[in-house]
Amino acid sequence: MPYAPIIGVLGYVLHPDGERALMVFRSRDGDLHQGKYNGLGGKLENDEDVIGCLHRELMEEAGITVTAERLRGAISWPGFGAGGEDWFGFIFIVDAFTGDVPERNDDGPLDWLPIDRLLGGGEPLPMWPGDRHFLQLVFDDDPRPFHGVMPYVDGVATGWSYRR
């Protein structure tokens, strides 16, 4: 059977100080990500490319206009969805934007979190445990994009591999 995942984008918006990234603390009832910090993003619509999707999602979720972004990688998440749906995501860093970030959006509060906290420094943040694997690659100094796969079964990551 052909692999036909839901395609999405995930963006990590850098604060102008370069030390923090914008995250949403998902607090909407019934949300698969409820109680966890996550980057911003969403599903690709059938009339857009992935950069257009990133720009649209960040305008909708954070009220910002992206002016510079970098593709950091792509990840296949077989079985990740609430009903076991497969996801395939393009992961970006947003280096520059215009606009003022609100305190919250429909999904929950928006917070500028220190990147070192996202990478595991200090008190652990409530996040998907699997995110800690790929966030190291998102924020490292290697300019090459990564290409990973992280299978999920019943909401738990069962593996992680990547190539550059």
Regions found by a protein language model. Give the residues of each.
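Conserved N-terminal beta-strand and adjoining loop/helix that marks the start
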Residues: 1-22, 43
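A generic fold-level signal
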Residues: 4-6, 16, 31-32, 84-86, ...
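Unchanged
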Residues: 44-67, 77-130, 137, 160-164
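Short connector loops at helix/strand junctions that flank enzyme active sites
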Residues: 6, 34, 39, 66, ...
